């Protein structure tokens, strides 16, 4: 089963600095008609789940309490049941609204000897998930609006910060329709709070993947980027309770060194929706750009750290007024 999922606000948007003319956009989880996984940037790239455990923990510190397994015998069953759970989520997802509080951070350093420039803001918006269904497909779109109902993202971008979204849809990598596009490995078991979880690593496969993170610059030419990551899956019900994604490889051609997203999902029971929905409760995003290539005459680093918190999920209904 495949669902088209995209962010109407262009997913991730960012500017190099406040007032800068450079504006890029990343759209997460957009299904393309052509294969998104151009293998050229990923030649000789190996997923980090293939690294020895000590090296993997350095990359993903959340795995420090992992109890590794030696066999992959349970992987097929875990993927099957998790995929069915993800499919069920997309079948039941409906129009939703929530309150979103975001902490925005930007750190810029122009030269190795210069002092880093740190800036930040806290903002609040209305977060919408809207489902548009037709006979043959179902599109799930995210929006953000301010108190006046206007597009929220443009205001933040003009201030030089990055706006990040797409988190409610990120479990799509594990849906039954998209699992063939990735490689998976059962890493072991780990306790997350009171939950015992299966820990599964995944990596999109170049040449097969159609889900992608897409960056678009001033030239208008989009850059397709693939991801790898780790999912923590509740052993009782095969629900993904935490998901981390990283770039499959840095994209030096566009100056993108790192993009890490960590999503924690929480159970939401709406009064008029029979099945509970597992939706983002908190998200951390780190995006890092650099032009440093070993030559001290060319050095520029820019990083963003956003933290999102979601609360008060409700059914979204459009009010109509009949005018005589």
PLM segments and residue spans:
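Bacterial N-terminal signal peptides
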Residues: 13-27
């Amino acid at each position: 089963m495949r669902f088209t999922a995209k962010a109407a606000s262009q997913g991730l948007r960012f500017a190099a600095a406040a007032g800068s003319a450079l504006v890029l956009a990343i759209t997460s989880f957009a299904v393309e008609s052509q294969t998104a996984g151009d293998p050229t940037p990923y030649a000789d790239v190996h997923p980090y789940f293939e690294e020895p455990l000590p090296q993997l923990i350095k990359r993903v510190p959340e795995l420090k309490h992992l109890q590794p397994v030696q066999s992959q015998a349970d992987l097929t069953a875990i993927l099957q049941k998790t995929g069915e759970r993800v499919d069920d989520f997309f079948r039941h997802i409906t129009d939703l609204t929530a309150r979103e509080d975001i902490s925005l951070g930007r750190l810029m350093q122009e030269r190795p000897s210069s002092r880093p420039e740190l800036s930040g803001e806290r903002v609040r918006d209305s977060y919408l998930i809207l489902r548009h269904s037709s006979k043959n497909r179902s599109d799930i779109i995210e929006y953000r609006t301010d108190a006046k109902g206007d597009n929220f993202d443009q205001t933040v971008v003009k201030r030089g910060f990055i706006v990040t979204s797409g988190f409610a849809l990120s479990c799509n990598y594990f849906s039954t329709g998209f699992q063939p596009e990735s490689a998976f490995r059962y890493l072991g078991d780990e306790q997350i709070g009171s939950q015992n979880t299966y820990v599964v690593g995944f990596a999109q496969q170049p040449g097969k993947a159609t889900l992608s993170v897409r960056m678009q610059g001033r030239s208008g030419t989009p850059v397709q980027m693939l991801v790898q990551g780790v999912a923590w899956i509740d052993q009782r019900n095969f629900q993904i309770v935490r998901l981390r994604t990283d770039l499959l490889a840095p994209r030096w051609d566009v100056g993108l060194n790192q993009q890490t997203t960590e999503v924690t999902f929480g159970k939401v029971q709406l009064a008029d929706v029979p099945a509970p929905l597992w939706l983002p409760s908190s998200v951390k995003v780190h995006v890092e750009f650099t032009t440093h290539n070993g030559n001290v005459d060319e050095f520029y680093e820019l990083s963003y750290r956003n933290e999102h918190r979601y609360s008060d999920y409700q059914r979204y209904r459009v009010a109509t007024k009949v005018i005589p």
